[in-house]
């Protein structure tokens, strides 16, 4: 008979889940960049590809510009978009939009290469968690309950795919309103 009840349950956010899995499966001791470190690595990445850039060839050295660029890279990471993909789309797109995408792809690619050789970017945590779960059966035979979400990013989807693959059962509770249109507050849950 399988154990059941509160003494055997854990309440984990995605971040706490990553910490738990890495502490059990290895990898928790890897260094992670803080906010300042991320800005410095991004600046170094930008400088390393500056000669190949068109739109961002003469970038502002102000922290606000780098912070804005880092916010863009964070969004791309959450949607599992790589620098290589951006560069390719940029080369296929004409005009200023294509040049911007190409430049962003080059910068992003350089940033990824630098973080791969040194400290981990914290925005890679979910991707790293999904990769670890492919090799470490943390959810094997477990009953999992998800609550408090209205939708999931593709990066979270990678983790959920591994959870679904391993778990005995998965129950997902979504807040949902009847009869509301696509613009309503519950529209993201409806699409999930």
Task: List each language-model region with its residue ranges.
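A structural signal for isolated positions on well-ordered beta-strands in alpha/beta enzyme cores
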Residues: 10, 143-145, 171-173
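Short, solvent-exposed loop/turn segments at secondary-structure junctions
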Residues: 17, 150-151, 177-179
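Basic/charged alpha-beta structural segments of nucleotide/phosphate-handling enzymes
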Residues: 1-138, 187
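Flexible, charged surface loops at secondary-structure boundaries
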Residues: 136-141, 164-165
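Conserved RecA-like helicase ATPase core segment
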Residues: 156-192
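A short, structure-level motif marking secondary-structure boundaries and short turns
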Residues: 96-97, 144-145, 178
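Conserved P-loop NTPase "ATPase switch" module shared by AAA+ and STAND
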Residues: 139-152
